[in-house]
C-alpha cells in the first residue's frame, strides 16, 4: 500500500461492525480498497479507540476524517442505533489529533456514494440505461435501502457539488395497491396500529409479510427469520416465494413514489444488505411494473433507471465522496 500524501480516514459505523479505510482526495478513485478493514464494535469502548487501533495497525497518521454512523447526527453528537456508543465529534477529533472530522448519517453516505459509482458497481433492474455523468452536470438521484430498517434519501448535484438529502421516508405510511395488500395491511395494523413502509420493506418486513400471508391462509408459520424465508423461497416453498414476490412489488411501488416526491428523474439506487439477496427476484418480479405504474406519469417513470448497488463498501465509498466534496467547498462555506 502506498499511503496518500494527505490521507483522510473514512469510516462506516453500524450497530455490529465498524469499517475503516483511507481515502485519497486527489485520486480519481479516492477510496483505497486495499486499506479497508472491519472490526466488531463490541471490542472497543468508543469510536475513537477503534479508529486509533485501525490507524496504528495500518501505520498511517491521518489528520482528517469522515465517519458515517448508523444513527441520527445531532450537532456535535451522534448515537448509533442498537449500540451504546455516544459519539462526540469534538472529543473524537481531539483524541485522534484531527484538524477536521465530519460526522454524517450512514444513509447520507450511501447517497454520496452515487457520485463515485462506476457501471461495474451496479446492476440494472429496469428503465433506461445509466452511466456516470460528469460532476458538472445537474442531477437528481434517489436512494432507498432495505436492511434492518428502510433508509430513504437522495443526492442533488449542482455546479460540481453534491448535496445528500436525508429523510425519514421509511416511516411514511404504507399505501396498499391491491386487495391482497389491503388484507396484509389490516393484519399488520392489528399488531402495530399505524403501519409504515419500514414494517414491510426491510429484513424484519419479510417476516411480517410472511406472517400475514400465513394468517390469510389459516396457517401458523412458527418463528422465522428473514434468512429462513429467502432459503425457503429458493427451495421452492410457495408461501415464501409469494412473500418475496410481494416484497419486491411493494418495494417497487414505494421506490416509484419516492421518485415522484423527490423529482429523482435521473435514477434510483437500491442499496442495503438485503438487495443482493433478492436481486434475481427484483429483476423478475413486479418491481418495475409497480415502480412505473404511476397513472399520468407512467410514461416518464418507464425511463427512470433503477439500479442495484453491488459495491462491497458503498458506505466507505460515500464517506470518501463526502471528503472529496468537502475539498470543493469555498473558503468559509460550511460542509
Swiss-Prot record:
Keyword terms, alphabetized: ATP-binding, Cytoplasm, Glycolysis, Kinase, Nucleotide-binding, Transferase
Intracellular or extracellular location(s): Cytoplasm
Transcription regulation among keywords: no
Gene Ontology terms: cellular component: cytosol
Main location: cytoplasm
Superkingdom, taxonomy of origin: Bacteria
Positions contributing to ATP binding: 11-16
Known EC number: 2.7.1.2
GO molecular function, one term: glucokinase activity
GO terms of biological process kind: glycolytic process
Catalysed reactions listed for this entry: D-glucose + ATP = D-glucose 6-phosphate + ADP + H(+)
UniProt-listed Pfam families: Glucokinase
Stretch forming the signal peptide: none
PANTHER family: GLUCOKINASE
Family, as annotated: Belongs to the bacterial glucokinase family.
Protein name from the UniProt record: Glucokinase
Origin species: Xanthomonas campestris pv. campestris (strain ATCC 33913 / DSM 3586 / NCPPB 528 / LMG 568 / P 25)
Amino acid at each position: 500500500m502506498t499511503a496518500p500524501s494527505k490521507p483522510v480516514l473514512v469510516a462506516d459505523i453500524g450497530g455490529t461492525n465498524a469499517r475503516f479505510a483511507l481515502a485519497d482526495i486527489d485520486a480519481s478513485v479516492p477510496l483505497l480498497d486495499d486499506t479497508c478493514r472491519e472490526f466488531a464494535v463490541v471490542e472497543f469502548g468508543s469510536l475513537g479507540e477503534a479508529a486509533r487501533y485501525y490507524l496504528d495497525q495500518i501505520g498511517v497518521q491521518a489528520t482528517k476524517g469522515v465517519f458515517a454512523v448508523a444513527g441520527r447526527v445531532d450537532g456535535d453528537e451522534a448515537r448509533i442505533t442498537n449500540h451504546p456508543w455516544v459519539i462526540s465529534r469534538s472529543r473524537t477529533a481531539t483524541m485522534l489529533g484531527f484538524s477536521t472530522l465530519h460526522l454524517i448519517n450512514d444513509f447520507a453516505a450511501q447517497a454520496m456514494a452515487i457520485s463515485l459509482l462506476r457501471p461495474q458497481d451496479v446492476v440494472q433492474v429496469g428503465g433506461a440505461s445509466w452511466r456516470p455523468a460528469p460532476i458538472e452536470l445537474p442531477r437528481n438521484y434517489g436512494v432507498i435501502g432495505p436492511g434492518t430498517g428502510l433508509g430513504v434519501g437522495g443526492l442533488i448535484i449542482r455546479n460540481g457539488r453534491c448535496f445528500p438529502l436525508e429523510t425519514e421516508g421509511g416511516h411514511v405510511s404504507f399505501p396498499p395497491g391491491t386487495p391482497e395488500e389491503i388484507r396484509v395491511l389490516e393484519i399488520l395494523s392489528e399488531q402495530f396500529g399505524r403501519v409504515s413502509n419500514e414494517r414491510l420493506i426491510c429484513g424484519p418486513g419479510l417476516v411480517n409479510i410472511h406472517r400475514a400471508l400465513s394468517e390469510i391462509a389459516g396457517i401458523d408459520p412458527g418463528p422465522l427469520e428473514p434468512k429462513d424465508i429467502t432459503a425457503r423461497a429458493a427451495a421452492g416453498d410457495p408461501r415464501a416465494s409469494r412473500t418475496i414476490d410481494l416484497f419486491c412489488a411493494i418495494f417497487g411501488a414505494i421506490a416509484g413514489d419516492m421518485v415522484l416526491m423527490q423529482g429523482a428523474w435521473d435514477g434510483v439506487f437500491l442499496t442495503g444488505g438485503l438487495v443482493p439477496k433478492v436481486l434475481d427476484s427484483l429483476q423478475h418480479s413486479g418491481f418495475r411494473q409497480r415502480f412505473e405504474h404511476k397513472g399520468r406519469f407512467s410514461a416518464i417513470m418507464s425511463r427512470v433507471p433503477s439500479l442495484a448497488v453491488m459495491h462491497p463498501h458503498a458506505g466507505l465509498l460515500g464517506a470518501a465522496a463526502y471528503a472529496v466534496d468537502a475539498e470543493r467547498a469555498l473558503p468559509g462555506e460550511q460542509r
